[in-house]
Regions:
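Non-catalytic signal-transmission and effector/linker regions of two-component phosphorelay proteins
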Residues: 1-27, 31, 158-162, 282, ...
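Canonical tetratricopeptide repeat
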Residues: 193, 227, 261, 295-296, ...
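Conserved phosphotransfer microenvironments
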Residues: 59, 72-94, 100, 349
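Single-residue signature of alpha-solenoid repeat helices
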Residues: 173, 207, 241, 275, ...
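Acidic, metal-coordinating helix/loop segments flanking the phosphotransfer/catalytic sites
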Residues: 55-73, 80, 205, 212
Length: 444
């Protein structure tokens, strides 16, 4: 039936929709006044009571409203000052695990491939891209409501299974997904959700078979490919994982939460050009979490070490600069990056970075030892190396290499045997398990 902009509350055909909305609590979260007004008008015309309609232009207001009034119908703007509708969606899911009990719609400025894929991945009810017309928007809202009112047995069973997954009842969820397989001629989602349930239960080989079954039905379906990638990574079948990751990249916009797995597959297979491509993608993201920061930073560091090993110092320098940007100032990566820069002779960058680095980084063992190793490789005089090693020990850092540098340097400087023996004794006291190595310098 065609639906025009005028919605007749009294029409018999519309009674199920009117009844559905009569007691729904609705929350509209949108930064644009024109969008808010259009959405408000639509919901009012569809019969939502004013007392049940909450509207805000602020994410800060939206979160407490979600927690307080617990709306069952939410329309939320995609991005709010680096906050997103998906954060609100997670709250809604925690309150109402069964997706049949709620409607969640995202509004956005554009239907980008990445956003469309995220909507599909999360199985959100709809995406409305601005500018939208009143008639088209109302039509879509009614279509979504009708789909909730008359779900197929297949969709209802999937929702029951997903609700159990959200509640942590994994085995019960798996049984629902197995049941759903027989309720549709093309049960791609049932196979995929069963696969993820089996992954949670650590039934990795069984999960792998589920994802492969979904791919037989739909060879390029994202959930099946992403699940299969996860299985291969867990089983350390890295070449297979890499091949699946290439298929994901070729056929789909990469989801940020899947990027760590793609990076790991590329690193483990030595496909470092891919890691650099993932960095370019990473830099375009509005939101990144710690897992993603850690993955791309570690991946770039491994890539730079590979480049240095093959003698491509220029490429390594570029990669290290990228790692410096990607790590977002995290000390654990800054230390390694700076240490690699020192070994790569990137003196200009080192001075610049150290000037703004926190003391935790500047005075870390990784940086001090990297500086010493660089001076050793550069052929610095034994006297200067001994001086550097002694300064590092005085700073509280303990490392067997420091004592070896002091002992070997002192021998080269032809210091008095008594002094050298005292240094060896001190080294043996600090690291008794390495006494044989230290005393070996005296024998030589």
């Amino acid at each position: 039936m065609a639906i025009e902009s005028g919605f007749d509350l009294k029409a018999k055909a519309n009674k199920p929709i009117v009844d559905f909305l009569a007691n729904q609590k609705v929350l509209i979260v949108d930064a644009f006044s024109a969008s808010r007004n259009t959405l408000r008008k639509i919901m009012t015309e569809l019969g939502v009571k004013s007392a049940n309609l909450e509207i805000t232009d602020s994410f800060g207001d939206a979160e407490p409203k979600l927690l307080g009034i617990q709306p069952t119908f939410v329309m939320a703007d995609y991005v709010f000052n680096k906050k997103s509708a998906f954060e609100l969606f997670e709250i809604t899911k925690s309150q109402f695990p069964n997706r049949l009990d709620t409607i969640f719609i995202v509004t956005a400025d554009a239907e980008t491939p990445l956003l469309l894929n995220r909507i599909e991945d999360e199985e959100i009810d709809g995406l409305f891209a601005r500018p939208f017309t009143y008639a088209s928007l109302q039509r879509r809202v009614i279509e979504i409501i009708r789909s909730k009112l008359t779900p197929s047995p297949y969709y209802r069973t999937l929702c029951d299974g997903r609700a159990r997954m959200t509640l942590g009842k994994i085995e019960e969820a798996m049984l629902e997904f197995v049941k759903a397989r027989n309720l549709d001629p093309n049960p791609v989602l049932a196979w995929c959700h069963e696969g993820y349930a089996r992954l949670k239960l650590k039934h990795i080989e069984a999960a792998e078979l589920c994802f492969k079954e979904s791919l037989k039905l739909e060879p390029k379906n994202y959930k099946g490919l992403a699940g299969l990638l996860e299985c291969y990574l867990v089983r350390q079948k890295f070449e297979d994982a890499y091949n699946v990751s290439r298929c994901i990249v070729a056929e789909h916009a990469v989801r940020p939460r899947r990027l760590p797995g793609l990076i790991r597959a590329a690193v483990m297979c030595g496909r470092f050009d891919d890691v650099l491509q993932f960095y370019d993608f990473y830099m375009k993201l509005d939101e990144v979490d710690d897992t993603l920061i850690n993955s791309i930073s570690a991946g770039l560091l491994v890539c730079s070490k590979y480049q240095m090993k093959r003698g491509d110092q220029a490429a390594a320098a570029i990669t290290l600069r990228k790692a410096m940007i990607a790590c977002k100032g995290k000390a654990i990566y800054l230390k390694e990056i700076l240490a690699s820069m020192i070994l790569n002779g990137m003196s200009d960058e080192i001075v610049s970075v150290l000037a703004s680095a926190p003391n935790e980084v500047k005075n870390s063992e990784e940086i001090r030892m990297a500086e010493l190793n660089y001076q050793i490789q550069a052929g610095t005089s034994p006297g200067r190396l001994v001086e550097m090693a002694m300064d590092i020990i005085k700073s509280g850092i303990r490392n067997t290499k420091l004592y070896e540098v002091i002992i070997s340097g002192s021998i080269k400087m032809k210091r008095r045997p008594q002094i050298i023996e005292e240094i060896v004794n001190e080294a043996c006291k600090a690291f008794p398990e390495h006494a044989k190595t230290f005393k070996g310098y005296l024998a030589a």
